[in-house]
Amino acid sequence: MSESLTWHDVIGNEKQQAYFQQTLQFVESQRQAGKVIYPPAKDVFNAFRFTEFGDVKVVILGQDPYHGPNQAHGLCFSVLPGVKTPPSLVNIYKELAQDIPGFQIPPHGYLQSWAQQGVLLLNTVLTVEQGMAHSHANTGWETFTDRVIDALNQHRNGLIFLLWGSHAQKKGQMIDRQRHHVLMAPHPSPLSAHRGFLGCRHFSKTNQLLQAQGIAPINWQPELES
């Protein structure tokens, strides 16, 4: 089943559930009421669009989308080209520069190249109101992303989950450590990065774990031109 399962199956199943219909109706009603909701409707499910279920190698869990203009586009930690790199991603790049030989910090925060190589960049909550962090928490998204993680946990093997910060680590408690690899560190936010995110070497460790399974490593270098 795992080879043939797709996000269309997983998400299609959830769309039949009352809780998820309510979540989608809530988000749509907020947009209809004139509130600015990020990311745009066309981008909400981009994490699944760019990384098919059977192609996932690595899962990075974020919290909720960036809530400033033109930032969020459906991939956690990533921002659209032309937007200033947010502080957490600055620290991710700082760690990559220490961890991966030859890594050059790009002048942008666009991580689509990671997604296209099998890195699922998944926020726990997939929408947010402009300027209001966590405004769409507890509206059903957490249940949906629990089901997503559960599907990966049950139907895939040897995935590498990068859980940064207590929120992601709590979310990842269900992951079967016998089937998958779980790497944990503090969140890359400026508030906590110096408590152990910087120096965690998760990117080189991820590639070592992939290569040990005979799987191609991730090229963590985003294009220097956005």
UniProtKB/Swiss-Prot annotation:
Family matches, as Pfam families: UDG
Record field: catalytic activity: Hydrolyzes single-stranded DNA or mismatched double-stranded DNA and polynucleotides, releasing free uracil
Location(s) in or outside the cell: Cytoplasm
Protein's job: Excises uracil residues from the DNA which can arise as a result of misincorporation of dUMP residues by DNA polymerase or due to deamination of cytosine.
Active site: 64
Molecular function via GO: uracil DNA N-glycosylase activity
Entries under PROSITE patterns matching the protein: U_DNA_GLYCOSYLASE
Protein name as annotated: Uracil-DNA glycosylase
A GO term from the CC aspect: cytoplasm
